[in-house]
UniProtKB/Swiss-Prot annotation:
NADPH binds at W11, R30, K103, A136, R251, V275, E277. Keywords: Cytoplasm, Lipid biosynthesis, Lipid metabolism, NAD, NADP, Nucleotide-binding, Oxidoreductase, Phospholipid biosynthesis, Phospholipid metabolism. It comes from Methylobacillus flagellatus (strain ATCC 51484 / DSM 6875 / VKM B-1610 / KT). GO terms for molecular function: glycerol-3-phosphate dehydrogenase [NAD(P)+] activity; NAD binding. It catalyses: sn-glycerol 3-phosphate + NAD(+) = dihydroxyacetone phosphate + NADH + H(+); sn-glycerol 3-phosphate + NADP(+) = dihydroxyacetone phosphate + NADPH + H(+). The lineage of its organism: Bacteria, Pseudomonadati, Pseudomonadota, Betaproteobacteria, Nitrosomonadales. The active site is at K187 (proton acceptor). This is Glycerol-3-phosphate dehydrogenase [NAD(P)+]. One of its GO terms (biological process) is carbohydrate metabolic process.
């Protein structure tokens, strides 16, 4: 089988390396200099280090060639580039099913990736989302990783999951596309909050409180959109949130840490080297939550820090001074 992976960042490349152990893989990016570098070195030195590409992994700069003969497309482009990627897939006449690993909400529309897929591909085409607690640096080293593939069709979810599953990479399946998408988007925003807390030396108790109240926030938002409550206690909810709020490779947590240490957002993004989806997602989540009438105090404070000049200390004080209430969702 041939699997086409769109996006040659750390996670796209880690997936390409993992999947190419069992299938032919075409890894595409539009950055010509990056393509040449990967073709010459047979590694992604820019984003992932010197993990060597095998014979079944081809690097492509031409999207048409990358998609030619594909049995499955896996899009790992940032959320704000996802719609354009789908438009290009349609323009080239490729009818292979699409799975994406983007985690966020589209800027301006505040749409989740599955809503973008509905806009561009419709419901008749098979598509799904791959998400869960997964750092590229660990997967590529052969460390055990478990994720969930949720799709608009249960049979397709099982089939696509079987294509990606193997060895140290466990792929569970689901049909709760909404819940899985929300978990992936919200955990990035909440990880910024956890980073701020850690950067301010608020301690382990505070981090645990942010994570658990973050799960409540994530669940309220997801259920209001039509997701299943139990999804948020699984890999793509609690699992991904815990990892992203505590792990050393978390870009979103790093943003929070550096904000707490006095750096401006512009300084952080200039030197981060990778996309931190939570930065762009917070504003869109607040917008969508307002439309739904869902209370999201942690996300709102993160948005205030990122986009409205509120200090991390003031944001933390605002959360601590909230009225006492029941722990219920």
């Amino acid at each position: 089988m041939k699997i086409s992976i769109l996006g040659a960042g750390a996670w796209g490349t880690a997936l390409a390396l993992q999947i190419s152990r069992r299938h032919q893989v075409s890894l595409w990016t539009r950055n010509q200099a990056h393509i040449v570098d990967m073709q010459v070195t047979r590694a992604n030195l820019q984003y992932l280090g010197d993990f060597a590409f095998g014979d079944q992994l081809a690097v492509e700069g031409d999207l048409g060639r990358a998609l030619d003969g594909a049995d499955l497309i896996v899009s790992v482009v940032p959320t704000n580039g996802f719609r354009n990627a789908l438009k290009e897939i349609k323009r080239l006449g490729c009818d292979a099913p699409v799975v994406w690993a983007s985690k966020g909400l589209e800027a301006a529309t505040a749409k989740l990736p599955h809503e973008v897929a509905q806009d561009e591909l419709g419901d008749s085409r098979h598509w799904g989302v791959l998400s869960g607690p997964s750092f590229a640096a660990e997967l590529v080293r052969g460390l055990p990783t478990a994720v969930t593939l949720a799709a608009n069709d249960a049979e397709f979810a099982a089939r696509a999951g079987a294509m990606l599953h193997g060895g140290n990479f466990r792929v569970y399946t689901s049909t709760d596309v909404i819940g899985v998408s929300v978990g992936g988007a919200l955990k990035n925003v909440l990880a910024i909050a956890a980073g701020i807390s850690d950067g301010m030396q608020c301690g382990n108790n505070a981090r645990a409180a942010l994570i658990t109240r973050g799960i409540a926030e994530m669940t309220r938002f997801g259920v209001a959109l039509g997701g299943a409550k139990e999804t948020f206690m699984g890999l793509t909810g609690a699992g991904d949130l815990i990892l992203t709020c505590t792990g050393q490779y978390s870009r979103n947590r790093e943003v929070g840490l550096r904000l707490a240490n006095g750096q401006t957002l512009q300084e952080i993004l200039k030197t981060l080297g990778h996309v931190a989806e939570g930065v762009h997602t917070a504003r869109e989540v607040v917008k969508r939550a307002g439309q739904l009438g869902v209370e999201m105090p942690i996300t709102q404070e993160v948005d205030q820090v990122l986009s409205h000049g509120r200090s991390p200390r003031q944001a933390m004080e605002n959360l601590l001074s909230r009225e006492q209430k029941s722990e219920a969702l």
